[in-house]
Swiss-Prot record:
Protein name, entry field: Response regulator MprA
InterPro entries: CheY-like_superfamily, OmpR/PhoB-type_DNA-bd, Sig_transdc_resp-reg_receiver, WalR-like, WH-like_DNA-bd_sf
Native organism taxonomy: Bacteria, Bacillati, Actinomycetota, Actinomycetes, Mycobacteriales
UniProt cross-references to SMART domains, sorted A to Z: REC, Trans_reg_C
Transmembrane annotation, as ranges: none
Annotated gene: mprA
Residue ranges annotated for the Response regulatory domain, each copy included: 4-118
Length: 230
């Protein structure tokens, strides 16, 4: 049975382009032109994933994210943001989106992001696993709970996958390319700063109450989880 994706964008040309591309690649696609239509469609016939523009009339993409997450709905969400709008990306992730893609984008990259997001969704439900701990940071792969010093930390799927990879390899330097391959998939383009954005997000969330930094940059190589700078 085909994976069902709801595409939400007020630009008809964008909707139709995504419908053709996703359908050609084996997905079942439904369309909505604003947030109100999107929430109705999700209520009536819940899709497997959501591609959501941020700027829309009536109800924007950020509010759709917030409303879904406030009810505990963990529907995988990829938001489409303005090319140079860092604030939109930050707001989208804060609202609960799992990943973001700046416009204009290559369809190949959108397909790669969607495949990676759906892979992470499948891994969310797989098997039993032990809690992972480093310093005062704890991650539970089954319940998907993350705490630091007992403080609960809320992460999106992408942030969780990235932290899980780091905590599974404590004090080992992970190259940028290896992280991109494992978290986003082998077909993920290595250009752009998506990884840096998510590292920044993890740092902000894990250091929100002044805790010492655990995620360090190894310049020119990648990142490492350790108590002190390398």
């Amino acid at each position: 049975m085909a994976v069902r994706i709801l595409v939400v964008d007020d630009d008809r040309a964008v909707r139709e382009s995504l419908r053709r591309s996703l359908s050609f690649n084996g997905y079942s696609v439904e369309l909505a032109q604003d947030g109100v239509e999107a929430l109705d469609a999700i209520t009536n016939n819940r899709p497997d994933a959501l591609i959501l523009d941020v700027m829309m009339p009536r109800l924007d993409g950020l509010e759709v994210c917030r409303q879904l997450r406030s009810t505990g709905d963990d529907l995988p969400i990829l938001v489409l943001t303005a090319r140079d709008s860092v604030s939109e990306r930050v707001a989208g992730l804060d609202a609960g989106a799992d990943d973001y893609l700046p416009k204009p984008f290559a369809l190949e990259e959108l397909l790669a992001r969607m495949r990676a997001l759906l892979r992470r969704t499948v891994s969310d439900d797989s098997g039993d696993s032990q809690k992972m701990t480093f310093s005062d940071l704890t991650l539970d792969p089954v319940t998907r709970e993350v705490t630091r010093g007992g403080r609960q930390i809320s992460l999106t799927r992408t942030e969780f996958s990235l932290l899980e990879m780091l905590i599974a390899n404590p004090r080992r330097v992970l190259t940028r390319s290896r992280i991109l391959e494992e978290v986003w998939g082998f077909d993920f383009p290595t250009s752009g700063n998506a990884l840096e954005v998510y590292i920044g997000y993890l740092r902000r969330k894990t250091e929100a109450e002044g805790e010492p930094r655990l995620i360090h940059t190894v310049r020119g190589v990648g990142y490492v989880l350790r108590e002190t700078p390398p």
